[in-house]
Amino acid sequence: METKELILKKALDMFAKSGYDSVSIRDIAKAVNIKESSIYYHYKNKQDILDS
């Protein structure tokens, strides 16, 4: 699975479990074991992930 897909899958799981407002980009990066900058390479922001 590519990084972008991993970010999306993990973020959506986290949003469902904890709520969108409770999850940060930092939380997603930590869960996927990547740097925050890698998320911003693929997505503009958290809303962009949700809209994907």
Predicted regions and their residues:
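Append "Primarily bacterial transcriptional regulators
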Residues: 27-31, 39
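An amphipathic alpha-helix adjacent to DNA-recognition modules
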Residues: 4-9, 13, 21-22, 33, ...
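Cytosolic nucleotide-binding catalytic cores of signal-transduction proteins
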Residues: 18
